[in-house]
Amino acid sequence: MSTYGFKAFDKNMKNRYGIEFEEGKTYQTNSNVSFGYNSGDEVTGYHFCKNLEDTLRYVDGINDDIKIAEVIGSGNIVIYNDEYYGYYDMYSAEIIDIIHILTREEIINKVLYSKNEYAAERFIKGFKLTIEELEKFKTEYISSYRLQYFLNTQEKNKVLELK
C-alpha cells in the first residue's frame, strides 16, 4: 500500500525532531511503525499528511521559513485522526519518498485550486502570506469577512515593519 501526501520541514529540510531529509531520497525505519515519536534515536515512522494545510500543525509557517514536500509513504502505514482538533488522514509510514519540494507558488496554488474554503482558511492561519498573496484568496468560495481579518493583520504588520 502506498499513500500520497505532504510533509513540512524547516528551511534546512529538517523535521521537528531534527532529522534532515533530501528531495529525491527514500527513508526507511526498521522499528514498529506508530504515530508519535519515541525518545532516543528510534524513528517509529515518517509522518506526513494527506492535506497540505494540515502539515502546518507541525511547523511554524507564520514566523519561520518552511518547506513543504510532496511525498509517498509505503510499507506499513498507520493512520491517525485527531477528531478533537479536526485533523484527519495523518500518517506514519515505514518508508517515505521525498518526491518534490514545492515552490511557494506551487504551495499557494494547490490550496487555491482545491476549492475548499475550510482548507484555505486553515492554510491562511498557518502560513505567512503577503498582502498580494492573500488577495488571490478573494474568491466566491472564501468568506470575505474571514479573509478581511487576515488582510487587516498583514497590513498592520507591514506598517509596523516600516516604522
Go through each PLM region and give its residues.
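Short, glycine-biased loop/turn motifs at secondary-structure junctions and
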Residues: 1-163
